[in-house]
Amino acid sequence: MSQNYYQILGVSKTASQADLKKAYLKLAKQYHPDTTDAKDAEKKFKAINAAYDVLKDEQKRAAYDRLGHDAFQNQQSRGGGGNHGGFHPDINDIFGDFFSDFMGGSRRSSRPTSAKVRGSDLKYNLTINLEEAFHGIEKNINFSSAVKCNTCHGSGSEKGETVTTCDACSGVGATRMQQGFFTIEQACHKCQGNGHIIKNPCKKCHGMGRYHKQRNLSVNIPAGVENGTRIRHTGEGEAGIRGGNSGDLYVDITIKPHDIYKVDGANLHCKLPISFVNAALGGEIEVPVIEGGKVSLTIPAGTQNGDQLRLRSKGMSKMRSTIRGDMLTHIHVEVPKNLSKRQRELLEEFKKESINEKENDGSFFNKMKSLWS
């Protein structure tokens, strides 16, 4: 009586996939024709590959356990599937370095496309204003995408019809052809690599399990988002083919330039015009802030044009943090162009008082030099 596949690999029927692979690699290395001169090495090597080819595949293994060794082999020979004892792909774990060097450092996989294909990822460009970036916001976006067919529920088959397993490849979606020591794996010609046959395709999706439509999706933009941030929405991309997993949606954020503020990380910069009187005497003025409303800013006496005053924690919010940046005000001292008679008289008095400072002496020229240094 011939050995069954579990006996060939020396494992129990409850062996895990990890145990199967470990046993296979050990035996394949032991009986590979290039590593031993034993007379029966080639025969054992083929038997080891045939056993692992079936047991590593959950569907094949289940069928093997259900039918038994002899009945399963008969079905395989009728269906045309199976490895038939050639090189199994996992043999690369043993001889990978050798083949990589021999083939110029490249080993390419020729595995066929499976029946279920993951949907494509999508990208959406979303423009928001600075206030929305500060507070965070829910935005509704519209885009075209492939969605799961609601008639066949992604199977690709007309409602009520069953999908049959391809008898040419036993549902694997691939056939193997032996050429010397190498096994070439290619997509099954009968099912085009799907592993099953759809005899009556769904009319709505034409057997693809999905179709295109306009979608409306609400996306959450967190407070403190920065320009150029990419937000991933898992599973909101295109639906997969024939029940495959959906891709992801990536929302790329662009923040529109603001009329008042310039953004520098979490800090905000703005120009603040003040009168020359406030600059000279100092005082309190109200300035607008990004969250809305105004706050009081102290102007020190003698403030010069171009001075920078900081409002702590009045900048942008930081994503996933309670910390805020600062707002930096750049002072612009405004000189009045049209003076009333009384204003001119007061300035003339101020000018006379200032003569004592002797602006035409050496200190005046030193001040001029400092402005250019």
Curated annotation (Swiss-Prot):
UniProt-listed PROSITE patterns: DNAJ_1, DNAJ_2, ZF_CR
Record Pfam families: DnaJ (PF00226), DnaJ_C (PF01556), DnaJ_CXXCXGXG (PF00684)
Protein location: Cytoplasm
Occurrences of domain J (ranges): 4-68
GO molecular function, one term: zinc ion binding
Note accompanying the cofactor annotation: Binds 2 Zn(2+) ions per monomer.
Cofactor(s) named in the record: Zn(2+)
ZnF bounds (CR-type): 136-214
GO biological process terms, semicolon-separated: chaperone cofactor-dependent protein refolding; DNA replication; protein refolding; response to heat
Oligomeric form and interacting partners: Homodimer.
Homology family: Belongs to the DnaJ family.
PANTHER family the UniProt entry points to: DNAJ HOMOLOG 1, MITOCHONDRIAL-RELATED (PTHR43096:SF52)
Domain comment, as recorded: The J domain is necessary and sufficient to stimulate DnaK ATPase activity. Zinc center 1 plays an important role in the autonomous, DnaK-independent chaperone activity of DnaJ. Zinc center 2 is essential for interaction with DnaK and for DnaJ activity.
Protein's name in the database: Chaperone protein DnaJ
Name of encoding gene: dnaJ
